[in-house]
Amino acid sequence: MGIRYLLVLVLVLLVLGCEVQGAHMPQQDEATSPSLFTQMQESFYGYWGIAKSAAQGLYEKTYLTTVDEKIREIYNKSTAAVSTYAGIFTDQLLSMLKGDQ
């Protein structure tokens, strides 16, 4: 999965680079035309929105309720076990530090 994210990131940066290079516009007044940074930022936000909606659509398409329930169940069991053992460890540590009194 890491290679997919890296590939998507490289492609997005490549498209942004091509868009910035290919946008040769005649010089206009600085006050009327947005700066290059603003154009790049707007372009990035546009691509980010498209990628975000595509990822959300893919997530909704592949969402499995049984897997979600299993993950929640495993999380609940593991947090209960960790809190139990953390309590035992804390009690042991306090009794070692306090000593016999």
Swiss-Prot record:
It is found in: Secreted. Proapolipoprotein C-II is synthesized as a sialic acid containing glycoprotein which is subsequently desialylated prior to its proteolytic processing. Proapolipoprotein C-II, the major form found in plasma undergoes proteolytic cleavage of its N-terminal hexapeptide to generate apolipoprotein C-II, which occurs as the minor form in plasma. Its main location: secreted. GO terms for molecular function: phospholipase activator activity; phospholipase binding. Keywords: Chylomicron, Glycoprotein, HDL, LDL, Lipid degradation, Lipid metabolism, Lipid transport, Lipoprotein, Secreted, Sialic acid, Signal, Transport, VLDL. Residues 78-101 are annotated as: Lipoprotein lipase cofactor. GO terms for cellular component: chylomicron; high-density lipoprotein particle; low-density lipoprotein particle; very-low-density lipoprotein particle. Residues 66-74 are annotated as: Lipid binding. Disulfide bonds: none annotated. GO terms for biological process: lipid catabolic process; lipid transport; positive regulation of phospholipid catabolic process. Residues 1-22 form the signal peptide. InterPro entries: Apo-CII (IPR008019), ApoC-II_dom_sf (IPR023121). Belongs to the apolipoprotein C2 family. Component of chylomicrons, very low-density lipoproteins (VLDL), low-density lipoproteins (LDL), and high-density lipoproteins (HDL) in plasma. Plays an important role in lipoprotein metabolism as an activator of lipoprotein lipase. Both proapolipoprotein C-II and apolipoprotein C-II can activate lipoprotein lipase. This is Apolipoprotein C-II. The gene is APOC2.
